[in-house]
């Protein structure tokens, strides 16, 4: 199997690239994600796939996630980006009361399988409103999966799994990554998933 050494950002970029190429239903939306943008994991993708599939949005987290929920209900596979995790609370109603609960409120007849990707900047001197790790909030919400990869391999495989997750019981997924870390790892260049449904990857465990 062909392998390449990649950083987390490069691994996420490749996962998004391969997902966009594999399925026309996949599209990305978020603030400043189109070229030239501020998001390393989406670099080059709007140039390659066009602005219909890599959408720059206004600065409104509620609108980003709300649009993703509507698109998912219509059969698309949206990957929404919240640029900084601290602001994910602005989209809490769309995440919790719409995406996560829709399956239960419709007895399984309707789901909104979205992927929400965000970043953590804690420890990088980014200030009190750009450095929180809020993953635990959403672990208490039925219908959501929370993924925090620790390696580039986990990042690529778990993001792919989240986008194409076949288990619609968890209709809303968040994908949180510490993309600033400089860890490099040799990972498969081809598209792969980690678990069906999503597994725990290869995160180190301490007791």
Segments (PLM) and residue ranges:
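Thiamine diphosphate
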Residues: 1-168, 172, 176
